[in-house]
């Protein structure tokens, strides 16, 4: 025995491999329990957030239904769902107003409504034109192709105003992939037009038609444009748009905002 090493240090305790395993298991259990608590908290937070979002969406549906009972419930639900989807993706989070167009209604009838969600008021209930190549009184041909002179559907985000060939107009960004992404390139804008004449529509059997723009009466063009400009939404319902109410299926893209 090498005495230079001195007597064993009794203050230094050793543990067996088995005891080390037990201690490690205990620490693992504590860590696992902590992870479970953290995960459960995150799940609960996400669940609460989802519940609040659903509640807000339901509130808007109920509000619009009361303010504009002429709009079919399914169309309202579709429009609000598409709007909320865009907002969850960071577009129009401060939007206060939503316009809904139902292109399954004849052009001779009022088929465009503008609702102020914050003030809880119906601002407009009006006629709106569809593209000349989309159909006679009700659009049956829909296109997002440049030069098609057809109406495009889906969710639009309003931008700035300008004065062009049709007077005071409002730029629109198409947010619905496969439906209206070419809106900026097609120069699809909101403007007033003399051919949007409800009285003439009675004798003609249809309202005057546009080159694809959601044109309105000249008399109400400016106030309606001012009500919607700068970060609000317009939703155009028609054939096939029900799919746009499903957020998360990549039916909506924000890429067109860079156009």
Predicted regions and their residues:
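Cell wall/extracellular polymer interaction/catalysis modules
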Residues: 59-211, 219-259
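Positively charged, low-complexity intrinsically disordered regions
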Residues: 13-14, 28, 45, 112, ...
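Polar low-complexity intrinsically disordered regions enriched in Ser/Thr and small residues
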Residues: 9-12, 31, 52, 157, ...
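Bacterial N-terminal signal peptides
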Residues: 36, 42-53
């Amino acid at each position: 025995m090498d005495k230079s090493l001195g007597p064993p240090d009794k203050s230094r305790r050793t543990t067996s491999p088995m005891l080390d395993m037990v201690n490690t298991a205990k620490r693992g259990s504590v860590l696992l329990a902590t992870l479970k608590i953290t995960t459960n908290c995150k799940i609960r937070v996400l669940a609460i957030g989802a519940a609040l979002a659903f509640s807000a969406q339901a509130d808007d549906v109920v509000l619009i239904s009361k303010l504009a009972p002429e709009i079919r419930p399914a169309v309202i639900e579709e429009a609000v769902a598409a709007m909320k989807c865009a907002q969850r993706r960071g577009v129009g989070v401060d939007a206060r107003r939503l316009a809904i167009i139902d292109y399954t209604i004849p052009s001779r009838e009022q088929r465009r409504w503008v609702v102020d969600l914050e003030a809880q008021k119906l601002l407009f209930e009006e006629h709106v034109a569809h593209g000349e190549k989309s159909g006679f009184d009700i659009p049956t041909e829909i296109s997002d192709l440049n030069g098609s002179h057809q109406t495009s559907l889906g969710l639009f985000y309003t931008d700035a105003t300008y004065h062009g060939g049709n007077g005071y107009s409002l730029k629109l960004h198409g947010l619905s992939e496969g439906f209206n992404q070419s809106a900026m390139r097609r120069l699809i804008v909101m403007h007033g037009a003399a051919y949007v004449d409800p009285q003439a529509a009675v004798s003609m059997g249809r309202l005057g038609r546009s080159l694809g723009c959601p044109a309105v009466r000249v008399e109400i063009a400016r106030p309606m444009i001012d009500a919607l400009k700068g970060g609000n939404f317009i939703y155009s319902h028609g054939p096939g748009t029900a799919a746009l109410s499903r957020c998360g299926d990549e039916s909506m893209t924000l890429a067109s905002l860079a156009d």
